Amino acid sequence: MIKTAQSVGELTRAIKNELESLFPFVRVKGELSNVKQHSSGHVYLTLKDSEAQIPAVIWKSVRARSPLELRDGLEVIAEGRLEVWPPAGRYQLICTALFETGEGEQRLALERLIAKLAKAGWFDAERKKPIPRIPRRIGMITSPTGAVIRDMSDVFARRFPAAELLLYPVQVQGERAVESIVRALRYFNDPPKPEHKPDVLIVARGGGSSEDLQAFNDEAVAEAIYRSAIPVISAVGHETDLSVADMVADLRAGTPSIAAERAVPDREELLRLIDNLVNRQSILMEGLISGAQLQVDSITSSYAFNRPVQMLGQFEERLALMEKEMKRAIAEKVRDREQQLTAAADRLAMLDINRTLKRGFALVTQDDRYVTSAKSLEADAKIGLTFHDGQREARVTE
């Protein structure tokens, strides 16, 4: 008995459906060859290694997003999906992203780290600590110079000058950045003095390239944030940047300025809240007085108490005294809170490092580290001096 045969088209369609469903996404490493830029804007090429080769296509829209200069011999990591092209009876790779080998491997390492931490539950919302509504002290982990510290200080001064600011200066990029950031997080969690322990921490840096932000994708920094007993707000780069530190932190802010806004309440809003509370107390007090007055009127109009007028006088005196005392207590609370806010604003102004530098002080650095003791400097050592209006270099003499 002769079985019914499939047509070439039927078999090819079956292969196409099976293959494309099995490989909706692939990531493959290889060498480019036969790179051809078509007039349509599409790029046709072959991805190969010592054992095999795969034809590949990069559509015009994908090519426009890639900064790579495609050339024969370039080692790349390609991402995409497999597709069967029936007219030629072959399969090809439809590329959705292309990375040079070094960049691609770094991306893969980052993806593996994110997958590892996600599996460990480090990103889970259930483990994230709430940010205190009214923090007394705020620890800032960032560079001591530049726009970040100025922007955050301006926000704190405007919104909530009562907060005490604690700065741990760190390197935010470079070889020592990871060690510096981890050391700062550990310091604030176990400071030598109780008054150095903040209620909330902000880890921040300005925008930059992916290489500049690399320290905030390091597992050691992620672990230090995860282990922190103090709530951590992460503000790394711009709103479009997302680092591992952002994902582990208890709260992610798009920019350092936004982090400062999320860390503290608005002073004007607090004052409005106080005014509302005062008004509510006043209304409550007036209601109590009105109720008491009605009782007094009822009593004085009754036959039994119509004669002892002196009792009515006593009630009125007590009511007047109660009203006076309640108004005085409310006024004192409002006055005390205003004095606290004013004092806090003065303390915040005193913490401004530029103000200190203008009084004749300078920051001393050696090899990008802050010098805190004369004993640590040897003769003829090269040092950096940061003044309020610029920087100079100097050498140490005996």
UniProtKB/Swiss-Prot annotation:
Function: Bidirectionally degrades single-stranded DNA into large acid-insoluble oligonucleotides, which are then degraded further into small acid-soluble oligonucleotides.
Protein name: Exodeoxyribonuclease 7 large subunit
E.C. number: 3.1.11.6
Subcellular location: Cytoplasm
GO cellular component, one term: exodeoxyribonuclease VII complex
Assembly, per entry: Heterooligomer composed of large and small subunits.
Superkingdom classification of source: Bacteria
Signal peptide residues on this chain, from the entry's feature table: none
GO MF term set: exodeoxyribonuclease VII activity; nucleic acid binding
Annotated organism of origin: Chlorobaculum tepidum (strain ATCC 49652 / DSM 12025 / NBRC 103806 / TLS)
Keywords in alphabetical order: Cytoplasm, Exonuclease, Hydrolase, Nuclease
Family stated for the protein in its record: Belongs to the XseA family.
Catalytically driven reaction(s): Exonucleolytic cleavage in either 5'- to 3'- or 3'- to 5'-direction to yield nucleoside 5'-phosphates
Annotated PANTHER family: EXODEOXYRIBONUCLEASE 7 LARGE SUBUNIT
GO biological process: DNA catabolic process
